Amino acid sequence: MRITKIFKDYRLFEIFILGIVSGMPLVIIFSTLAVWLKESGIDIAVITTFAVARLSYSLKVFWSPLVDNFKIPFLSRWGHRKSWLILCSSLMALVLIAMSKENPEVSLTSFYFLTILLGFLSSTFDIAVDALRIDKFDQETQSIASATAVFGYRIGMLITGAGALYLAEITGNNWQLTFCVIAIIFVVATIFIITVNEKELVREKINIISITSWISTVINPFKDFFKREFAVTILLAVIFFKLGDAMLGAVASPFYIELGYTKGEIAIIAKLYGLIATLVGGFVGGIVMYRVGNFKGLIITGIAQSLTHFAFIWLNHQPPSFEALLIAITIENFAAAMGATALVGYIGNLCNKKYSATQYALLSSASSLCNNTVTIYAGKLVNMMGWDGFFLFTIILALPALFILMYLNTKVNV
């Protein structure tokens, strides 16, 4: 297929828009909500417990067969994948409207429930979007579709990251209005989803046999992985590799607010410019892995991403300035993206090609599940250690992974 014909394909526009919608809730849960809570006077130890809402992204593999096979009454006439997208998108709009009506200072329990529900709906939406993309495109155009979806996803993250912070800033900290605007975007998205074309496929009905088969598809890749020598040690390296970065990420936005940075400055530097630093770092990380190999690449990027946390200790002792935040964000995002790229490549090489998709999902889910669980306690550690002590602790957290990788380098050929 000619490249010009590919980019004239309307299906790519559909996937791009769905990618935007898919990326929007993630940043609300991971970052934007933390700024609102911090400005409302909520303690950092409480704010980081909202990380429990992220667990849905790690656990979604367990209910993805339901999204594949269960027909939603009434909505399924629009199309099987679309029915799940319509349901999740419309419910996310309602959740965001409900959040806009709440005051976190007086209704924190409601905020917990709504945030967890948003995470569940968002992760389920992701399952349906990925499935729809795979259904709509053949093998020749699948990579273009995936790249388009990722690009849309990044745009969605900017809308609810930089966009939401900037809107809250110019409206005088009117978070209620900000969340209402985001909810309206989801309403418009729901209407758009109805117009999306879906290729209907014959689907297997859920029964005892299919449930047993589903259990086997999850268990067998696990069994295959743990048959290998040093399997548990490898898994520990994967889990610890990004743990320090995950801990830092959980408190970054409240940290900027506490230092005296405005939401507009955070939007422009941490979110908008930070994305550029992340993309460049990811590209460099890929080159490093290609040049020096998996183990050496992981060790190099692992050391780099942990040492860059010293930039936050330095930032903690600087008066709020555009330049200081720019330097810290450049160093941290660049190195973190290098590490993330290296980890993705390493996990990919660990997978048995017979179970590549499932083992990759399970290994990455194990890493994110542990990280998201531990980050719940990040705020308590900040209160106990102070900011400098906490950032030093995140550097130390990288050491187990580095020592394990150095040990494995002499034992395992990956």
Curated annotation (Swiss-Prot):
It comes from the Bacteria. Its main location: membrane. Pfam families: MFS_1. The chain crosses the membrane at residues 15-35, 44-63, 84-104, 109-129, 150-170, 177-197, 230-250, 268-288, 295-315, 324-344, 360-379, 389-409. SUPFAM superfamilies: MFS general substrate transporter. GO terms for cellular component: plasma membrane. It is found in: Cell inner membrane. Keywords: Cell inner membrane, Cell membrane, Membrane, Transmembrane, Transmembrane helix, Transport. One of its GO terms (molecular function) is transmembrane transporter activity. Signal peptide: none annotated. It is a multi-pass membrane protein. Belongs to the major facilitator superfamily. This is Putative transporter AmpG 4. It comes from Rickettsia conorii (strain ATCC VR-613 / Malish 7). The gene is ampG4.
